[in-house]
């Protein structure tokens, strides 16, 4: 009985964490909204998108977990402290995420990513829209970076899970908060919202997922302080909802 409860708590923990963080972010949006939002017109659609995402993610994880990834580092590397391994993991994963995201904004691959850009308003749950191919490509970067955590302490994986949940919700939040100094290193809502803008100059800008350094190094950086006027979001074309969800 105890084992069953333990397994149940372990299975429910990510969902409880997701909604706990979501409620905090919703409170922040209510107190300091960047733009007025009609939550009722969006929330139920995004709840459905969340359900589809969870089902798709579970399937993708089951499949990709079977991919054999060799330990491609010298044996001496695995004696490094867990903190060092975790930092290296994030550098490799985030570098991969940047290039996968950049690939998704090319014509041949755009269809699998455009659902993510379809919300007309951005708020903490808006970033959950993702097709199955979208999830697969982003999950591959995690898998390729995973050998860096070989023999790492278990707490490192807890940190990654919590950070991944916070990150996606955080960067899409509808808040007025800004910090130019933080944006020198990390992606913020203000920074990422530019990427979701309908403006052609913004569409392939600020592609970073966690760190802003890749945008600065590879020519896709757009300074949030240079934005003139209000941003508008959504797609510049009408696409069938079915095609959006499937990614074709």
What positions do the PLM features span?
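Short, Lys/Arg-enriched N-terminal segments with co-localized hydrophobic residues
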Residues: 2-7
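A membrane-cytosol interface segment of integral membrane proteins
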Residues: 229-248
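Specific transmembrane helices
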Residues: 12-74, 78-98
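Membrane-embedded catalytic scaffold of the fatty acid hydroxylase/desaturase
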Residues: 51-60, 80-232
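A transmembrane-helix-recognition feature enriched in membrane-embedded lipid enzymes
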Residues: 22-23, 30, 47, 209-220, ...
């Amino acid at each position: 009985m105890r084992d069953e409860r333990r397994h149940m708590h372990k299975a429910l923990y990510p969902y409880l964490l997701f909604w706990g963080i979501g409620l905090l972010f919703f409170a922040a949006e209510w107190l300091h909204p960047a733009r007025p939002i009609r939550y009722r017109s969006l929330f139920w659609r995004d709840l459905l998108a969340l359900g589809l995402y969870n089902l798709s993610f579970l399937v993708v994880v089951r499949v990709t977990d079977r991919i054999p990834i060799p330990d491609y580092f010298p044996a001496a590397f695995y004696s490094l402290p867990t903190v060092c391994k975790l930092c290296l993991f994030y550098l490799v994963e985030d570098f991969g995420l940047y290039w996968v995201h950049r690939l998704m904004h090319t014509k041949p691959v755009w269809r699998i990513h455009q659902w993510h850009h379809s919300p007309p308003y951005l708020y903490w749950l808006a970033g959950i829209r993702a097709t199955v191919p979208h999830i697969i490509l982003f999950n591959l970067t995690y898998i390729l970076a995973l050998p860096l955590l070989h023999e790492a302490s278990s707490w490192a994986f807890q940190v990654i899970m919590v950070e991944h949940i916070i990150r996606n919700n955080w960067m899409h939040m509808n808040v007025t908060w800004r910090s130019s100094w933080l944006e020198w290193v990390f992606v913020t809502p203000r920074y990422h919202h530019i990427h979701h803008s309908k403006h052609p100059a913004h569409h392939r800008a600020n592609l970073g997922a966690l760190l802003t350094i890749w945008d600065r190094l590879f020519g896709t950086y757009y300074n949030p302080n240079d934005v003139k006027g209000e941003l508008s979001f959504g797609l510049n074309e009408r696409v069938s909802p079915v095609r959006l969800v499937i990614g074709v």
